[in-house]
Regions:
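An aromatic- and histidine-rich active-site surface loop
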Residues: 10, 37, 73, 89-126
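Short, hinge-like loop/turn segments at secondary-structure boundaries
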Residues: 44-49, 110-111, 132-135
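Membrane-proximal helix-turn-helix segments that form the acceptor-binding/catalytic region
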Residues: 78-82, 105-109, 122, 136-147
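Short acidic/His/Gly/Ser-rich catalytic and metal-binding motifs that mark active-site loops
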Residues: 58-60, 123-128
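A short, charged, and often flexible helix/loop element on the N-terminal side
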Residues: 50-78, 133-139
Length: 147
């Protein structure tokens, strides 16, 4: 799993990861942190966390304009690529549409399945992002509490 936010701040991601573990899957989660002391690997309730240091600008501002600014994707491609070169995975599971490009890149480069799990309502972005209007994604989830 790849999450552009800090963890365990997102309860939905935690519940999903724990459900996958309960079903017999090994779950790794690559996520951002703004605190140097949290950088590195940790086991959290069976979830193998891989935290990478982000800057406040990248974390708060760049993701707003990520569809226009390539350095946001470059940062995440580097992090995902580093993890995929050291670990073996069958699937890359991206949380939220802004990182869909990174998931598609990993699918092509590393030959793994790509799951996009959108926790937010991004209908206005669906027309803009070719990754959601094609067969480039193997599975697309959208889980909203309310519509």
């Amino acid at each position: 799993m790849v999450l552009e936010n800090q963890f365990p701040d997102d309860e939905r991601v935690e519940k999903e990861a724990l459900s996958l573990i309960k079903a017999g899957h090994e779950v790794h989660l690559l996520c951002a942190t703004l605190k140097k002391e949290y950088v590195g690997d940790e086991n959290y309730k069976g979830i193998k966390l891989h935290r990478t240091l982000s800057t406040p600008f990248l974390y708060n501002k760049a993701k707003i304009a990520c569809l226009r600014l390539p350095f946001y994707f470059m940062f995440w491609k580097k992090q995902v690529g580093n993890l995929l070169r050291t670990e073996t995975f069958d699937v890359i599971h991206i949380h939220d549409l802004p990182l869909a490009e990174v998931g598609y890149w990993a699918k092509k480069k590393f030959g793994i399945s790509f799951v996009l799990d959108s926790h937010e309502n991004y209908p206005y972005m669906l027309d803009m992002a070719p990754y959601t209007n094609s067969r480039k994604i193997d599975v697309f989830f959208c889980s909203l509490e309310t519509l």
